Regions:
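Conserved "HGTGT" condensation-loop signature of ketosynthase/thiolase-family condensing enzymes
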Residues: 2-84, 118-192
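Alpha-helical membrane segments and immediately flanking helix-loop junctions
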Residues: 92
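Hydrophobic alpha-helical hairpins/lids featuring a short glycine-rich hinge
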Residues: 99-130
Length: 192
């Protein structure tokens, strides 16, 4: 008989979204992530950091300053116990979501009692494709390397979404985000 635990998301926070030449430029991903985790723990004082057994970090380009098992570095910089594990998940755009899944699965399976799922990407430090891209040309025969733009075009055609509909959606999305910023709707989720 196997009794499964339940997992819960008790809080979520993030960094501000940065633009090129913004104030965020120059911050290391691991330092910023550690700052966010410290902020998360500070606002959840009922959470004992000694109970956190794993940190799973999603990262599409875990190389350069985002390499060397960055989750472990973040864990140490965030003053989590040395016993807290760390691993990096790379599923490109789905990396952070997969980190949430993996922490939840570990809790449900009884492997850990508490964990932190996170994600990080510094698009200004690591060039698109990585530092030394070495794509297997044979995969081009199978249409494996399709960029996001081409994927979007294929989906728009398949789902009959016009360019005008896409632009209207984008404008509405930006208006909603600006309205949320103006009305302080994001204040509780952004650290620092």
């Amino acid at each position: 008989l196997l009794i499964m635990s339940k997992s819960y998301i008790i809080d979520s926070v993030r960094s501000p979204i940065a633009m090129k030449n913004s104030d965020m430029l120059g911050f290391r991903s691991d330092d910023l992530s550690a700052c966010i985790i410290k902020g998360l723990l500070d606002r959840n004082s009922n959470m004992n950091k000694d109970d956190i057994e794993d940190l799973v970090t999603g990262c599409a380009f875990p190389e350069g300053p985002q390499g060397m098992l960055m989750a472990r570095s973040i864990s140490i910089l965030a003053d989590l116990p040395l016993s807290t594990g760390g691993k990096v998940v790379n599923r490109f755009c789905g990396s952070s979501m997969d980190s949430v899944h993996q922490v939840s699965q570990a809790i449900v399976a009884g492997d850990i009692k508490a964990g932190i799922a996170s994600g990080v990407e510094d698009m200004f430090t690591v060039p698109m494709g990585g530092f030394v891209p070495d794509f297997n040309e044979r995969l081009n025969e199978k249409e494996f390397y399709i960029g996001m733009g081409e994927t979007a075009e294929n989906l728009a055609k398949e789902l009959d979404i016009s360019r005008e509909d896409q632009e209207d959606f984008s404008i509405l999305s930006h208006k909603k985000a600006l309205d949320a910023i103006d009305n302080n709707k994001f204040d509780n989720e952004i650290i620092p």
